[in-house]
Amino acid sequence: MAIHAAYIFIAATLIALYVARRMREQHARQKLARDQGCEPLTTAINKLPYGLDRKWQIVTHRGNILDDLITTRFAELGCYIYTDNQWGSPPIICAEPATMKAVLSTKFRDWDMDSNRYPALGPWLGRGVLVSSHQGKGSLWATARALLRPMFANTATYNHALIEPSVQEFLSILGHLNQAGAPDKDLLPFIRRLNVDIITTVFCGGSINEQQSGLAIAVGADAKHRKPVLEEAFDTIEPIAGLRLQTGSMYWLFTSKPFRDGCETFTGLADGWINRALSKRDEKPDLSQDEGAAAREKNFTEELVSSTDDRELLRDILVQLLFAGIDTSTSMLSFALVELGRHPSAWARLRAELAAHNMLSGGPETITAAQLKECAFLQNIIKETLRLYPPVPINSREAIRDTVLPSGGGADGSKPVFVPKGTSLKYSPYVMHRREDLYGPDALLWNPDRWIGRAPGWDYLPFNGGPRVCIGQKFALSSSAYVLARLAQQFDTCTALPTTGPIDSKLGAVLVPKAGVPVSLTNSTT
């Protein structure tokens, strides 16, 4: 009996301590909210617990969820930051520059990656800069970023001569399409293969020749011909990865053997590059070469293996470089070409700008990085494409401590908002970039000239912002500008169906044109 009484006393004490702690936490939160003048957010009403009806709507929707579900809910609520009535810890959804600045920059230490990010994408991307926590000294994110920073600071990474063979292969394939009478064939798979070859050349020690592998199915292909290895892996992984991201804590519902096999394709390729780099690192140095020559021969992967022996981290970094480098550039180039095809005058203007900088009539040797930066219209084409079609249109963070957002509360949305620890926040550059109050009444139109005299701010986040801004941003912009310039050198015209309004898009791991890239690139001799 005494033992039972002791158990009851211990249990009651533990419960009392728990209740007391929760009461102290609640009191501290109320005080923080009161001291900061916080008021509640607008609340969207879900019909089922945990927002199950909303999650089901997202999973089963066959249209464009960004336009049909996400943008429309902002419009229905009449604000650009809100929460919902989900049980437990309701999320915050926003498309507000001030909120994004706070989360990504000024209150960076109060927020971390969404706790569902790693389990959702870990089977594919592993750890590293895209999915790891940035909290704590010596965090995995900081380690991975420190390994990558000197490589992206190296001017050799931006050497156009490295990527020119891949670009020449792409131009040759476009010539084959024209000769075969298929000038308006969907170019999306060819653009992705181009970027596979570029990224593997620059970062992995050599192209895997994805374009050559895909040449057999480029013109008059046998429908049964197997896709190139990375293309097949991408096509298998991305739809499932997109669902795993969009459904939050229910990511585990979406998996399959093809998905796991696709993930193994990426890790297998990365392991092969690492093994070759390690073998080269362990070779005895050639004393007949001076140190400068030896250093110049090191590729990106060889530099990585000289900085760490953590094979798992090395593999994850390479896989993430493949994903981020290939998909981001593919998304941008695809949308840019479709918009240029819909606006023939813009293509003519681009060619005229290149001619004015003595880059039109010559070959690749006439195109320099410095001159590309001086081509204002070319740079504005890229900016405007990334505004209307950001590759990652929705992202997320999670509050790791009680914090306050600068605005969004109260009837007019001008008051601060208290955010308890554990709150998930989803933010949409896609919606923000299309706001008429930020970009004018023509916000839904592709207009590169809107960037004349306008500098990007926190209302423009195609590459994120703050300490976690995309480390490969400069490379993506540089290589994309070079490819567009080479295409403009080669082809007199770029045409697509003359439709109006934004291009219909499809969301997987990144945003791509739903109908592909049915663009015709031709010249007067074709």
UniProtKB/Swiss-Prot annotation:
It catalyses: cordypyrone A + reduced [NADPH--hemoprotein reductase] + O2 = cordypyrone B + oxidized [NADPH--hemoprotein reductase] + H2O + H(+). It is a single-pass membrane protein. The keyword Cytoplasm does not apply. It comes from Cordyceps militaris (strain CM01) (Caterpillar fungus). GO terms for molecular function: heme binding; iron ion binding; monooxygenase activity; oxidoreductase activity, acting on paired donors, with incorporation or reduction of molecular oxygen. Keywords: Heme, Iron, Membrane, Metal-binding, Monooxygenase, Oxidoreductase, Transmembrane, Transmembrane helix. The keyword Transmembrane applies. Pfam families: p450. It is found in: Membrane. Its cofactor is heme. Its EC number is 1.-.-.-. This is Cytochrome P450 monooxygenase milC.
